[in-house]
């Protein structure tokens, strides 16, 4: 569905192009079916290749965050580009979700838990 890799027990999601109303529902279903419902509770969402993101997708991110948090897991965003970072800031999502500059920085944090 979407590019990803698993490092130890951490799922690293790497969508590209756009996260929007056209694919956000599919993305959410895929994340739940393939990872959350199978017991993975450490998720990194890499946004470096995401060119744009809309409010529907932000809702999906919040939904994933809540689900991961409810089971004591870890969820973070990694390396959003300037445009996406601006959207995260305007919506104050950057105050709710941890954001890391690099995958290695985020992995270091999550694996140290």
From Swiss-Prot:
Keywords: Phosphoprotein. It comes from the Bacteria. The keyword Thylakoid does not apply. InterPro entries: Anti-sigma_ant (IPR003658), STAS_dom (IPR002645), STAS_dom_sf (IPR036513). Signal peptide: none annotated. Pfam families: STAS. Phosphorylated on a serine residue. The keyword Phosphoprotein applies. The modification Phosphoserine is found at residue 55. Coiled coil: none annotated. GO terms for molecular function: anti-sigma factor antagonist activity. Residues 1-110 form the STAS domain. Belongs to the anti-sigma-factor antagonist family. In the phosphorylated form it could act as an anti-anti-sigma factor that counteracts an anti-sigma factor and thus releases a sigma factor from inhibition. This is Putative anti-sigma factor antagonist TM1081 homolog. It comes from Thermotoga neapolitana.
């Amino acid at each position: 569905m979407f590019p990803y890799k698993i490092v130890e027990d951490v799922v690293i999601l790497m969508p590209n192009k756009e996260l929007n109303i056209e694919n956000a529902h599919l993305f959410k279903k895929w994340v739940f079916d393939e990872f959350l419902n199978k017991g993975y509770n450490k998720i990194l969402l890499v946004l470096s290749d995401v060119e744009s993101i809309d409010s529907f997708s932000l809702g999906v991110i919040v939904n994933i965050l809540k689900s991961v948090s409810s089971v004591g897991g870890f969820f973070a965003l990694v390396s959003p580009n300037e445009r996406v970072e601006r959207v995260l800031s305007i919506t104050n999502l950057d105050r709710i979700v941890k954001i890391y500059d690099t995958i290695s920085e985020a992995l270091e944090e999550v694996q140290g838990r």
